[in-house]
Regions:
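N-terminal small/glycine-rich loop or linker at the start of catalytic domains
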Residues: 69-72, 141-165, 283-296, 328-330
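Active-site-adjacent beta->alpha loops and helix N-cap segments on the catalytic face
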Residues: 138-147, 196-209, 255-268
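A cross-domain feature marking catalytic cores of carbohydrate-active enzymes
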Residues: 161-163, 192, 222-226, 247-248, ...
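Glycine-rich, proline-tolerant flexible connector loops at the mouths of alpha/beta enzymes
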Residues: 189-206, 327-336
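Conserved small/polar residues in nucleotide/adenosyl-binding loops
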Residues: 359-361
Length: 361
């Protein structure tokens, strides 16, 4: 494994795979804030050159957070299909990029490949792609998921109806709900961000949504975006729930800051499949976004694209219905301007598609 290259008459040497990944990233204000960004465009190009020549096995053996220290890393590594990985482990990241973009390789081929990839590999290949590359590659991958409705079919577009209210007033919520459905929104989800995160308030809104959906026979699923433990308790007390929501991070420390671990998410999924209102099998709804780990000092010195890819690696374990990347939501300290926001959105869409494309062979 060679971590140095000569460029413009200067030798650039990097200390670790983690540093190569970080400095090969397109410029992001969040990486600058974290102190992991390339110091110049020349160093960024040098890091990309080094990254392009790394083997996939180098990335497999050098996760940005050690296996022994992090639950998310363990989930990502343990879920790799080793038969597929053995066939591609000697590819370079550059060869992986060329393979994905080759017109001979389409949806089923890429879905087979994805089973052998870790999140670090997914992030690495994204860093070598132009915006157009990301669009073309993501567009090859077809992911369909089903709760009560099926989303992701080619040529279709689904939306979330979000009838938030400043005081969680039921009449105000339902007025927004009816207006939104009148516009044809909400086939992906009827989902409210609550002001009151209590079990009683969550139950009340879930019942209200479910009654409305059943009365008018609306083909959708509903959710109150309270904390996952609140939603579990609401379900245990009989509240009708379509999807279970939780914001997730790309490290165990980040998830701890959000107040959960993988066992809690598994409990939520099991409960929703047992007593929820969705036919399934996909009943989970996750939210991510580049930079969230830095907010809780849970990035472990890694860049925000790599940590975002790890979010999808964690999510994959639970076969979610929706994964929503809130690009730019946190603020300009992580994605400063529209150029960075657009790039992040394209990266996230590609990495999410490549990671979450599940097939059964």
């Amino acid at each position: 494994m060679i971590l140095k290259t000569k460029l413009f008459g200067r030798v650039y040497e990097f200390k670790s795979v983690k540093e190569v990944l970080a400095k090969a990233n397109e410029y992001k204000s969040g990486d600058q804030l974290a102190g992991v960004a390339a110091e110049s465009s020349e160093e960024r190009v040098a890091a990309k050159v080094v990254l392009s020549q790394l083997k996939l096995s180098d990335l497999f053996n050098n996760p940005v957070v050690p296996y022994e220290e992090d639950e998310v890393t363990r989930i990502i590594i343990d879920d790799v299909n080793l038969r597929t990985y053995e066939k591609i482990k000697n590819w370079t990241v550059s060869e992986l990029r060329e393979w994905i973009l080759d017109n001979k390789h389409q949806n089923v081929d890429i879905q087979w490949l994805s089973r052998g990839l870790t999140s670090e590999m997914v992030a690495a290949v994204a860093k070598l792609m132009t915006n157009l590359d990301l669009i073309v590659a993501a567009n090859k991958i077809i992911i369909t998921k089903r709760a009560n409705t099926t989303i992701g079919m080619p040529g279709t577009f689904s939306s979330r109806l979000q009838p938030n209210h400043t005081t969680d007033d039921p009449d105000g919520i339902m007025a927004s709900t009816m207006e939104g459905f009148a516009y044809g929104c909400g086939d992906a989800l009827l989902g409210l961000n609550p002001v009151d995160d209590s079990v009683e308030s969550t139950k009340r809104i879930l019942h209200k949504f479910n009654d409305f959906i059943e009365e008018y026979k609306i083909p959708t699923q509903h959710c109150v975006l309270a904390h996952v433990t609140t939603q579990i308790e609401a379900m245990n007390q009989g509240a009708p729930t379509g999807l279970v929501f939780q914001s997730i991070a790309g490290s165990e420390k980040g998830n701890e800051a959000f107040g959960f671990d993988a066992k809690v998410i598994q409990e939520a999924k099991d409960t929703a499949q047992k007593v929820g209102t969705s036919a399934g099998p996909n009943v989970m709804y996750f939210e991510t976004g580049q930079g969230s780990e830095l907010s809780s000092d849970a990035h472990h010195g890694a860049d925000q694209v790599t940590m975002e890819a790890r979010c999808y690696g964690f999510a994959k374990r639970f076969d979610p219905f929706l994964v929503n990347t809130v690009v730019g939501f946190i603020g300009p300290e992580y994605l400063y301007d529209s150029k960075q926001v657009i790039r992040a959105g394209l990266e996230d869409h590609f990495m999410g598609n490549l990671t979450l494309s599940l097939i059964h062979i």
